[in-house]
Amino acid sequence: NVNFSAIFIISTTWIIYLNFFLRRVAKIKNKKWLSVLSKIYGFLVFIFIISFIIIEGLLIFNISQFKEAKDIEKMDYVLVLGAGLDGEKVGNVLKSRLYQAIKYYNLNNKTNIIVSGGQGKDEIISEAEAMYRYLIENGVNPNQIIKEDKATTTLENIKFSKEILKNRGDEDKKVLIVTNEFHLYRAMIIGDMLGIKNEGLASQTPIKIRINYMIREYTTIIIDVLRTSIYKIKSC
C-alpha cells in the first residue's frame, strides 16, 4: 500500500504537469485540435482533482464521526468484514476488527455476529473460519456466530451477508458493520445502496499505514460504487 500511495502521488503529479505541457504546446503550435485536446484534458484533470478532494474530505469527516462501542445502540447483528490471515490465525488488521466486535458483544451479548470472508489463494482456511475460532477463544457463544465464507470483495461481504439476513427473516434488522476506519465509509455506502440499515464501528489503524489506505480509498470507493450500481441494475 505504501507503493500504491507513492505511485498515485507520482502519477497525479505527472497528470497535472501534462496538463500544463499540453496547454503550452497548443499555444506554441497554434493548432485548433491541440487547443481542443488541451481544454478537454484540462477539464478531466479538474474533475479528477475536485473529486479527489470531495471523496477524501467525506472520508476524513466520516472517520471523525464514528462512535465508540459503548455509545452505539443495541443491535441484533454485527457484521465483521474479513482481512488477511497469518497462517490459520487472524492477522493484526483483522484482530483489531474482532477486538471491537468483542467489545460490543460484551456490552450487548444477545447480538449475533456475522463473520464474512472467503478463502484467498494464499490462505489455508477461510477468513470466516479463522474469525469464528478467534471469537470462540475470546468468549463469544458459538451459537451466536454466523459464518459467511464465500466473499472475496467488500461488495460480496455486504451482499452475501444480506442474503443470510434474508434467509433468517431478519432483512429489516439494523446491522453494525465492523472494519477499519479507512474501510468503514465504503462498506457503509455499499450497505446503504443495497438497502441494509446500518451503523459503523471502526477499529484503529496506525497513522503511517492509515494515510496510505485512505489515499487508496479514492479509487476503491469509485470502483465499488460502480460495481454496486451495476449489481443493482442487473438484479432488477
Residue ranges and their predicted role:
Residues 1-27:
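Membrane-embedded alpha-helical segments of integral membrane proteins
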Residues 35, 54-216, 230:
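A structural signal for short, hydrophobic/glycine-enriched beta-strand patches
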Residues 41-56:
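Hydrophobic membrane-insertion alpha-helices, especially the h-region
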